[in-house]
C-alpha cells in the first residue's frame, strides 16, 4: 500500500494562500490553511486587483471565473506614461496574443471582497482543505510541506531565516474607487475630449 501524501500547510489565507490551498485541494491534496485573521477580516481589505489574461486562465482552471464575472470590470485600453521622459505607450486589444482577443478586455479590475468571499466559500466546501482562521496554526507533522504565503513581510520567512532582496524601482500607481450614480456613458465621454 502506498503511503498517503503529507498534509500541506499553507500559512496565510489572503489571495495567494487561498488560491494555493484551493488549487491543491482540487487536485486531491490534503491542505491545512491557517490565518490569524477571521473570514470577515480577510474580506475587509480595501483593495482592487488588475487581472491579466494569465490570471483569467488560472481563475478559469480553478472554477472561479464564471462566478466572478459580475464583479469584474474590463478595461480595453492601457495608457502608460513616463513623466521623466514624456514617453507614452498605449496598449489595446490588438496588442494581445490572438488567443486572448476574444475576451471582454485587455484586463479586468476585481475588488478584493468578492474574490475573497468566493475563495473562502469554495475552500469551506472543499473536503480536502481544513481551514483554521483566527486560531493558532496546528503543529505540522515532521514530513509536512509548508507554504509560506503570509505576506510581503512574512513572519515565517523571518523565523526561518530565509533571506530575500528587492529592487526599489521608484514607480507608483494611484488607484481610486469611484461610485458613479446616474451618470451616462455619453456624459463621461464628453469630458474626455
Task: Walk through the language-model features, giving the residues of each.
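A short, basic/flexible loop-to-alpha-helix module at the beginning of a structural domain
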Residues: 1-4
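A conserved short coil-to-beta-strand element within the FAD-binding core of flavoproteins
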Residues: 133-140
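Conserved FAD-binding catalytic core of PHBH/FMO-like flavoproteins
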Residues: 143-189
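A general structural signal for well-ordered alpha-helical segments in protein cores
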Residues: 52, 56, 115-116, 171, ...
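Glycine-rich FAD pyrophosphate-binding loop
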Residues: 26-45
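Helical element adjacent to the flavin cofactor pocket in flavoenzyme catalytic cores
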Residues: 110-132
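A conserved beta-strand/loop capping segment in the N-terminal third of enzymes
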Residues: 58-115
